[in-house]
Amino acid sequence: MSLICSISNEVPEHPCVSPVSNHVYERRLIEKYIAENGTDPINNQPLSEEQLIDIKVAHPIRPKPPSATSIPAILKALQDEWDAVMLHSFTLRQQLQTTRQELSHALYQHDAACRVIARLTKEVTAAREALATLKPQAGLIVPQAVPSSQPSVVGAGEPMDLGELVGMTPEIIQKLQDKATVLTTERKKRGKTVPEELVKPEELSKYRQVASHVGLHSASIPGILALDLCPSDTNKILTGGADKNVVVFDKSSEQILATLKGHTKKVTSVVFHPSQELVFSASPDATIRIWSVPNASCVQVVRAHESAVTGLSLHATGDYLLSSSDDQYWAFSDIQTGRVLTKVTDETSGCSLTCAQFHPDGLIFGTGTMDSQIKIWDLKERTNVANFPGHSGPITSIAFSENGYYLATAADDSSVKLWDLRKLKNFKTLQLDNNFEVKSLIFDQSGTYLALGGTDVQIYICKQWTEILHFTEHSGLTTGVAFGHHAKFIASTGMDRSLKFYSL
């Protein structure tokens, strides 16, 4: 039978057992340990020498103990030193085991702390977004206190009650009529002449991609869904993204001027104000936001709808917004006060609106519906004055030409239809490739060119209605396209998160 000492891991000369832990020890080692600690080395229970129980085993014949000479004395000293080393080694093993357990516990605590920090960070971010949403309500502007001639919004307005409509007052109607008269007169003066600075078709046909920017919106939620250029300075680009942000970008300096945060869902429509440093955005979160670009802050939240806002257009006066929604209503709102002036639906249709666009004169506008209809409305009378059937599938985009005569429309039927507003009929249909998607339509400022964006970007020359340019640079669906001043460049955005520019 072989016994092993629990301290030295060697066969003991004088084995004994501890009744506390039932472990076997070399008597001299355990006695030294008890003398120092008074406990059992295995379970740290109190233990005395009297409690130790000797174990009787058959020992091999051993030589007589050394006599008191110098060599035996050295051996005895070495034996004592070895005993001390064994005791120290055993203590270190115990401490190592304890340290490992403490380290494991600390690692679990660290992991739990990281999870808590991540959750709290997410909650703080959500709280900040909620605060940004509530801030526009802080400084309520009483509508009567804001003169109609005031050039810009200087405070934050109250999100209005959906049931509280101000109405189209005679003063507002007269203002709209006066502006339309001025614009019509200017258009007649211009006649059919094309600006000399406008890029010629043969030059436009040579356009190629000259720049691409992918850092405007989040990479984790890719996609730019809306695009607009500032009418007074087309170097200023406005985009709305799937990341819920609105971004103002300067083409000339290639710098982001402002990142506007506040929407709780993706941004699907954006509009630049032509003369004030304001931009507008709409989202499926059922809100329209008015932003100050210099302050990078929201100055008004217009709550005109109960469902997703699908279209946004600024009136020629620069004082009113037109919006369309999944709630089947179009709304006409005052940007000075953030209040809804009127809100109308076509009760005979009962269908969601997909887009909305003002005519250049501002007295009529068009809306697209989910059931393939294009409806023309009289703003002063709030009545549906004409319908343009012919598409199949939801209407995806509509665009009025600056000449005031043409309307371009697109739907999920791989076609673009051109309508003559004087004769109220379809005079041309651009039939595209099968499964070609059209998400954006726009005429240039002179009404000479028509651009469409979707599966790719195509440019047509009006009157002949022939394609003169075709871009396939976007790796995803093209969601927006726009012309620079006098068509000196073309801009496009897409689901590949890029803003691209094309020119000579």
UniProtKB/Swiss-Prot annotation:
Keyword Cytoplasm among UniProt keywords: yes
Entry comment, domain topic: The 7 WD repeats are necessary and sufficient to support interaction with the RPA complex.
Role summary: Ubiquitin-protein ligase which is a core component of several complexes mainly involved pre-mRNA splicing and DNA repair. Required for pre-mRNA splicing as component of the spliceosome. Core component of the PRP19C/Prp19 complex/NTC/Nineteen complex which is part of the spliceosome and participates in its assembly, its remodeling and is required for its activity. During assembly of the spliceosome, mediates 'Lys-63'-linked polyubiquitination of the U4 spliceosomal protein PRPF3.
Oligomeric and partner information: Homotetramer. Component of activated, catalytic and post-catalytic spliceosomes. Component of the Prp19 complex/PRP19C/Nineteen complex/NTC and related complexes described as PRP19-CDC5L splicing complex and PSO4 complex. A homotetramer of PRPF19, CDC5L, PLRG1 and BCAS2 constitute the core of those complexes. The interaction with CDC5L, PLRG1 and BCAS2 is direct within this core complex. At least three less stably associated proteins CTNNBL1, CWC15 and HSPA8 are found in the Prp19 complex.
WD repeat boundaries on the chain: 219-259, 262-301, 304-345, 348-387, 390-429, 433-472, 473-503
Signal peptide (UniProt feature, chain positions): none
Major location category of this protein: nucleus
One Gene Ontology CC term in the entry: cytoplasm
Subcellular location: Nucleus; Nucleus, Nucleoplasm; Cytoplasm, Cytoskeleton, Spindle; Cytoplasm
Domain of life: Eukaryota
Matches recorded under InterPro entries: G-protein_beta_WD-40_rep, Pre-mRNA_splic_Prp19_cc, Prp19, RING-Ubox_PRP19, Ubox_domain, WD40/YVTN_repeat-like_dom_sf, WD40_repeat_CS, WD40_repeat_dom_sf
Segments for region (May mediate interaction with PSMC5): 68-223
Gene name tied to this protein: PRPF19
Pfam families: Prp19, U-box, WD40_Prp19
Modified positions (N-acetylserine) in chain numbering: 2
EC number(s) stated in the UniProt entry for this protein: 2.3.2.27
Family per similarity comment: Belongs to the WD repeat PRP19 family.
Pathway(s) per entry: Protein modification; protein ubiquitination
Protein name: Pre-mRNA-processing factor 19
Catalysed reaction, written as an equation: S-ubiquitinyl-[E2 ubiquitin-conjugating enzyme]-L-cysteine + [acceptor protein]-L-lysine = [E2 ubiquitin-conjugating enzyme]-L-cysteine + N(6)-ubiquitinyl-[acceptor protein]-L-lysine
A GO MF label: ubiquitin protein ligase activity
